[in-house]
């Protein structure tokens, strides 16, 4: 993450900030699963089941949130800041949480409350329309944080990928195209396309060809068709008639 001409990065041996002018790194804390910077110049860091709030101007001024004390028993995966300045993080098995500044606590969004497709969440980001995009083991949730309205896109149905796991990424493009990574590939789509009604086409088969030869009803074609192909309910072919 680049913020105020500085690069913030987490590695196996810790979380660091790099001055882009001098190329010098400074150690901040031990390695984090995820981190974000809010509009008040605070660095929020997820480490295990702990959340740390650190002032960028005064790194020694920190606050520690032991998440199990707030009923968050599972390990968080990703944390982010929205354009409105809200802090959200997803928990694998625990759903989605928002930090409430007024109460200094966390508001929970879950599958049981109807806000999420699944509680097993891997990643979260914000779309250009200020919806939250949350990936999970069942698919993608679009959550409007202001109204609470949701839209679900399930794996294998709305999305051509069949599974999502921890580490699969999300990308929101300027033209509103969305990219979601899965275990079996990458898919892209537009949010508005999910709401388009599928057309119910009435399809029928007009002609039958076997080995580039048109098949007509009657014995001349080997009895494959007893009547015209559009009116045939079924046909039987042998192993030599598979082309």
What are these regions (language model features)?
Residues 16-20:
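Surface-exposed loop/turn elements that mediate protein-protein interactions on large endomembrane-trafficking
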Residues 4-6, 42-43, 52-53, 58-59:
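Sequence-structural signature of mature extracellular/luminal beta-sheet repeat domains
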Residues 12-13, 214:
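Soluble non-transmembrane domains of integral membrane proteins
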Residues 6-9, 42-45, 86-89, 131-134, ...:
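Conserved beta-propeller blade signature
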Residues 27-31, 49, 63, 67-78, ...:
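Residue-level "micro-hotspots" composed of small/polar
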Residues 7-11, 27, 33-39, 43-47:
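Solenoidal tandem-repeat scaffolds enriched in leucines and small polar residues
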Residues 2-4, 37-40, 81-84, 126-129, ...:
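Residue-level detector of Asp-centered blade-edge/turn motifs that repeat once per structural unit
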């Amino acid at each position: 993450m680049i913020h105020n001409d500085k690069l913030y990065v987490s590695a196996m041996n810790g979380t660091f900030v790099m001055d882009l002018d001098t190329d010098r790194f400074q150690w901040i804390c031990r390695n984090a699963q995820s981190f974000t910077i809010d509009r008040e110049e605070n660095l929020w860091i997820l480490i295990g089941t702990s959340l740390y709030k650190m002032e960028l101007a005064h790194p020694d001024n920190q606050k520690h949130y032991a998440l199990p004390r707030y009923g968050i028993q599972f390990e968080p995966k990703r944390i982010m800041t929205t354009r409105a300045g809200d802090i959200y993080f997803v928990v694998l098995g625990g759903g989605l949480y928002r930090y409430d500044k007024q109460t200094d606590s966390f508001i929970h969004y879950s599958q049981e409350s109807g806000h999420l497709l699944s509680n097993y969440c891997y990643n979260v980001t914000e779309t250009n329309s200020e919806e939250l995009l949350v990936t999970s083991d069942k698919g993608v949730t679009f959550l409007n944080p202001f109204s609470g309205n949701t839209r679900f896109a399930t794996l294998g149905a709305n999305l051509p990928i069949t599974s999502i796991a921890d580490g699969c990424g999300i990308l929101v493009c300027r033209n509103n195209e969305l990219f979601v990574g899965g275990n079996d590939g990458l898919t892209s789509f537009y949010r508005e396309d999910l709401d388009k009604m599928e057309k119910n086409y009435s399809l029928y088969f007009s002609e039958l060809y076997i080995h580039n030869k048109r098949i007509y009803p009657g014995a001349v074609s080997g009895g494959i068709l007893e009547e015209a192909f559009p009116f045939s309910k079924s046909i039987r072919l042998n192993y030599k008639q598979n082309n």
